[in-house]
């Protein structure tokens, strides 16, 4: 018989930097999960990702306190900020532009994000990422 899922925990942890301090420790501790076991497994799986990149993770906690986790791709906003070379998006995106991204950069980000997007094809994924870029106050060229 399959194990019963007790809880889902959604966190955003930097790649290769999971440790028992907040936010990881308290979130897992309240469900009785072995925190160090998660940290070691997460850090091992994120070795191939650029250190410091935020990685969304969904942890499924079972009734016997065991767990599994699924990693997602880094947020589009993080990838867009890195591509545009900026620290943060605009506070007034419609009037104040803070950077530029071109179609090639959007395609690269869309390729990275494709597993997590609901887009049917690459062009739809690029348009989705372009919308995120505009909402952050970036000028989008070539879309």
From Swiss-Prot:
Keyword Transmembrane helix (UniProt): no
GO BP term, pick one: translation
Organism of provenance: Teredinibacter turnerae (strain ATCC 39867 / T7901)
Pfam families noted in UniProt: Ribosomal_L11, Ribosomal_L11_N
Source organism, top-level taxon: Bacteria
InterPro entries: Ribosomal_uL11, Ribosomal_uL11_bac-typ, Ribosomal_uL11_C, Ribosomal_uL11_C_sf, Ribosomal_uL11_N, Ribosomal_uL11_N_sf
Record family assignment: Belongs to the universal ribosomal protein uL11 family.
Gene responsible for this protein: rplK
Function: Forms part of the ribosomal stalk which helps the ribosome interact with GTP-bound translation factors.
GO molecular function: large ribosomal subunit rRNA binding; structural constituent of ribosome
Protein name listed in UniProt: Large ribosomal subunit protein uL11
Keyword Translocase included in the entry's annotation: no
One Gene Ontology term, aspect cellular component: cytosolic large ribosomal subunit
Subunit note: Part of the ribosomal stalk of the 50S ribosomal subunit. Interacts with L10 and the large rRNA to form the base of the stalk. L10 forms an elongated spine to which L12 dimers bind in a sequential fashion forming a multimeric L10(L12)X complex.
Post-translational modification: One or more lysine residues are methylated.
Entry keyword set: Methylation, Ribonucleoprotein, Ribosomal protein, RNA-binding, rRNA-binding
């Amino acid at each position: 018989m399959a194990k019963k899922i007790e809880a889902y925990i959604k966190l955003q942890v930097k790649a290769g930097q999971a440790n028992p301090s907040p936010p990881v420790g308290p979130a897992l501790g309240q469900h009785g999960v072995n925190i160090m076991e998660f940290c070691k497994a997460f850090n091992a799986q994120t070795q191939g990702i650029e250190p410091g990149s935020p990685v969304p993770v969904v942890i499924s906690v079972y009734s016997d306190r065991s767990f599994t986790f699924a990693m997602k791709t880094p947020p589009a906003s993080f990838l867009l900020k890195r591509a545009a070379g900026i620290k943060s998006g605009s506070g007034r995106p419609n009037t104040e532009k803070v950077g530029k991204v071109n179609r090639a950069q959007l395609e690269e980000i869309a390729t990275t994000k494709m597993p997590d997007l609901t887009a049917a094809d690459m062009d739809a994924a690029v348009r989705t990422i372009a919308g995120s870029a505009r909402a952050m106050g970036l000028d989008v060229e070539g879309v």
